[in-house]
Design a protein with these regions (language model features):
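N-terminal cap/lid segment of alpha/beta-hydrolase-fold proteins
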Residues: 2-36
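Short, surface-exposed "cap/lid" segments of acyl-processing enzymes
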Residues: 36-37, 42-65
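Catalytic nucleophile-loop/oxyanion-hole region of alpha/beta-hydrolase
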Residues: 53-63, 74-103
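Short beta-strand immediately N-terminal to the catalytic nucleophile in serine-hydrolase-like folds
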Residues: 106-108, 132
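Gly/Ala-rich beta-loop-alpha elbow adjacent to hydrolase catalytic centers
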Residues: 108-112, 116
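Hydrolase active-site cap/lid region
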Residues: 118-160
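The feature captures the conserved acid-bearing segment of alpha/beta-hydrolase catalytic domains
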Residues: 140-142, 158-191
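C-terminal catalytic histidine-bearing segment of alpha/beta-hydrolase fold enzymes
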Residues: 193-196, 200-245
């Protein structure tokens, strides 16, 4: 899919205040934005259908904008290797292990939403997940031929053979999960909402929001109204955590 030069997917920068590596591969890096005094890190996990051609750079403007709102932000990169799906999750977990002495909120967009939900199940310092237009039901996405076969390319096979990577089939994380989808999204509604429908009866910490007059990129473009919606979602997670004690 081609986008005009001004589209958010074609934007990049500013780079983070600090950049660290969490492994030896070029994509095993984290950029940090904002003040380290904040006790909570907002971790951004980009989408792009797990394709090696789409990296974190289009989320740099969002990371910078969120830091200007007072959040301490970590923008992580991870390896995207067709047919090696566990590597992406392993990288996300390795990146998170490099963030010490902080609580984390995971924000994942599209394919990054799938990784965020999976990662939250594996760590103990996560207080919330915000999954925006997430690919949260791999088998449903496969049936929709999402991204022209992106799921099969990512997995290296059929989704039914990778049930341990399919969020809808797994128990939810212990932290709060906010599923956000958009009215004009090219990710089919059921691919995101099935996760909420599957788990809402078993957890009071799962919520679903459908944003009107918005598209797949609204929540990651800080130049529009999506930034306000995202900040509200982050603050909702923070306030609920305070309420839980």
């Amino acid at each position: 899919m081609d986008y005009p030069p001004e589209h958010i997917v074609n934007q990049s920068g500013p780079v983070g205040d600090l950049k660290i590596t969490y492994g030896g591969a070029p994509d095993q890096v984290i950029e940090f934005y904002g003040s380290t005094s904040n006790p909570t890190v907002l971790v951004l996990i980009h989408g792009g259908f797990w394709r090696p051609t789409i990296d974190r750079s289009h989320l740099q403007p969002l990371a910078f904008a969120l830091s200007a709102q007072g959040f301490y932000v970590a923008l992580i990169e991870y390896q995207r290797l067709p047919g090696r799906p566990y590597q992406s999750l392993d990288d996300v977990l390795a990146a998170l292990s490099a963030i010490v002495d902080k609580k984390v909120i995971l924000f994942g967009h599209s394919a990054g939403g799938q990784l965020a939900i999976l990662a939250a199940r594996k760590i103990t310092n996560c207080i919330g997940v915000i999954a925006a237009s997430p690919v949260a039901d791999l088998q449903a996405g496969e049936k929709e031929n999402l991204g022209d076969g992106a799921i099969n390319l990512y997995l290296g096979g059929s989704a039914q053979n990778f049930q341990d990577l399919d969020p809808v089939l797994l128990s939810p994380p212990s932290c709060r999960v906010e599923i956000m989808h958009t009215q004009k999204d090219f990710i089919p509604l059921n691919v995101a909402k099935n996760y909420y429908e599957q788990h809402k009866s078993n957890s009071s910490k799962i919520d679903f929001t459908l944003l009107a007059d918005s598209d797949h990129y609204t929540l990651i473009d800080p130049r529009g109204a999506g930034l306000v919606q995202l900040v509200k979602a982050v603050n909702k997670v923070l306030m609920n955590k305070i309420g839980e004690g």
